[in-house]
Each structure stands twice: as structure tokens, then as C-alpha cells.
């Protein structure tokens, strides 16, 4: 039995509220159970220096957590004077994931920065950030298309992410913190709307896992991604 009472293949409730910020070119608030992440997209009219005069655009991401997103207060990283290794790893993952869903030549020489701020954390914050970040990106690109700044749509597919793991000996979908903190194996799966793999991160936290178990988790992830893509489409109308 899962702590939440969910079935093994059952996602947490998912909602995505678009256009929650006045100034950002794209924004949304994604809720996956008790994990809530505010995602925004900001368009910059020039690419990073390494892409100057290449005709290619770029999508990058920044990630952070509010001090009381967790059960006890975390010190702000700005106060500490540097980002943690975990933060750097997560924001690189978000950027890689979202870039896999765009045609950078169609985007042109500009950069879109996705900011993901965790308001409340209960497991799966990086997955929620990718899923919500894509919606913010989509909304920002829509503005570029409407203004005629870009001619062809640079977004080639949906991108979403979900966690899966082995909890109490059973493969489960969309781990919350109670499960994630004690899972024998956990993983993050990033897929496109067409169910193509972008990134898989899996690790054995306790015992090793088999190839068959990995396949079971991928099957769960594919079903979860389908639900998340449906939520993205519903948010965009």
C-alpha cells in the first residue's frame, strides 16, 4: 500500500494554471499533488555569446526553492553565495529537456530563459519543473509567432517528465516525498508527446534492479507522460 493510498500506476492530481504572471512572456503554476512550482519564460533578444552569428537560438533554465517549500526552512542559496550541486544539476536537466523539444534554427538568434521556483515540495520537483516549464515556453513562443518575430513554430513536440520507482518492492508511478525518501530504486523519465525518450535518470538507492524492472518503470512512465501531456493541452486550451 502506498502512503497516499494511490494505486501503483496512479498519478497524483495534476493541474496547470497558465498566465499567472503579468510581465513574463509565458508562465504557469503547476501542481502535482502537494508539489507546486511556478514556471516563467523570459525572451531575450540575443543568444548566449557562443551562439552569436550561428542563426541558432537557445533555451536555458534556472531552478530554485523557496526557503519554506520544505518541512523545515532551507537557507537561501543567494545568502550562501553559491548554488548547490543539486540545484545546478536540476536546472541543467530542465534546460536539456526543453531544448530537445525545439528547432533551434527556427527560434532564431534569441534566448528563452525558463525560471522554475518551487513554492512547495513533496517529491518530483524537477519533473514538475520540466512539465510546467514546457507550458511557459509554449506560451512565450506563441507570442513570438503572433508578433511575426518567428515565422515557423520552433516547438516540435510536447516535453514532460515523471518520476517512477520501486517502493516496498513494487514499481510505482509519480513518487511523493514519503515514497521517494525510502524507495529502493528511483528514476526520472523525460519524454516527448510522441513517447520518444529524451532523458532517463535511474539509480538504485538500496538494492540493485533488473532490466525487467526497468522496463516496468518505463511502461509506467509512458502512461504518466500521456496524462501530463493531456494536462498541458488542457492548460493551453
Swiss-Prot record:
Protein EC: 2.7.7.56
This protein's UniProt keywords: Nucleotidyltransferase, RNA-binding, rRNA processing, Transferase, tRNA processing, tRNA-binding
Positions annotated to bind phosphate: 86, 124-126
Superkingdom assignment: Bacteria
GO MF annotations, alphabetized: 3'-5'-RNA exonuclease activity; tRNA binding; tRNA nucleotidyltransferase activity
PROSITE patterns attached to this UniProt entry: RIBONUCLEASE_PH
Coiled-coil segments: none
GO biological process, one term: rRNA catabolic process
Catalytic reaction(s) noted: tRNA(n+1) + phosphate = tRNA(n) + a ribonucleoside 5'-diphosphate
Disulphides: none
Keyword NADP: no
UniProt-listed NCBIfam families: RNasePH
Function description: Phosphorolytic 3'-5' exoribonuclease that plays an important role in tRNA 3'-end maturation. Removes nucleotide residues following the 3'-CCA terminus of tRNAs; can also add nucleotides to the ends of RNA molecules by using nucleoside diphosphates as substrates, but this may not be physiologically important. Probably plays a role in initiation of 16S rRNA degradation (leading to ribosome degradation) during starvation.
Subunit: Homohexameric ring arranged as a trimer of dimers.
Family: Belongs to the RNase PH family.
Protein name: Ribonuclease PH
Organism field: Cereibacter sphaeroides (strain ATCC 17025 / ATH 2.4.3)
Amino acid at each position: 500500500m502506498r502512503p497516499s493510498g494511490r494505486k501503483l500506476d496512479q498519478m497524483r492530481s495534476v493541474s496547470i494554471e497558465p498566465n499567472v504572471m503579468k510581465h513574463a512572456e509565458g508562465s504557469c503554476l503547476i501542481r502535482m499533488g502537494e508539489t507546486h512550482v511556478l514556471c516563467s519564460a523570459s525572451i531575450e533578444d540575443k543568444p548566449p555569446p557562443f551562439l552569436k552569428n550561428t542563426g541558432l537560438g537557445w533555451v536555458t533554465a534556472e531552478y530554485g526553492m523557496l526557503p519554506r517549500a520544505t518541512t523545515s526552512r532551507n537557507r537561501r542559496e543567494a545568502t550562501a553565495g553559491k548554488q548547490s550541486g543539486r540545484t545546478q544539476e536540476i536546472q541543467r536537466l530542465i534546460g536539456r529537456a526543453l531544448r530537445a523539444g525545439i528547432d533551434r534554427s527556427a527560434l532564431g538568434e534569441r534566448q528563452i530563459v525558463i525560471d522554475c521556483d518551487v513554492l512547495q515540495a513533496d517529491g518530483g520537483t524537477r519533473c514538475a519543473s520540466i512539465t510546467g516549464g514546457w507550458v511557459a515556453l509554449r506560451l512565450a513562443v506563441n507570442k513570438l509567432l503572433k508578433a511575426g518575430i518567428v515565422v515557423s513554430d520552433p516547438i516540435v513536440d510536447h516535453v514532460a517528465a515523471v518520476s517512477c520507482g520501486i517502493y516496498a518492492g513494487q514499481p510505482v508511478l509519480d513518487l511523493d516525498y514519503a515514497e521517494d525518501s525510502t524507495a529502493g530504486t528511483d528514476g526520472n523519465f523525460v519524454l516527448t508527446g510522441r513517447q520518444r525518450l529524451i532523458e532517463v535518470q535511474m539509480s538504485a538507492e538500496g538494492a540493485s534492479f533488473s532490466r525487467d524492472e526497468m522496463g516496468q518503470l518505463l511502461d509506467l512512465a509512458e502512461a504518466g507522460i500521456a496524462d501530463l501531456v493531456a494536462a498541458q493541452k488542457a492548460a493551453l486550451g
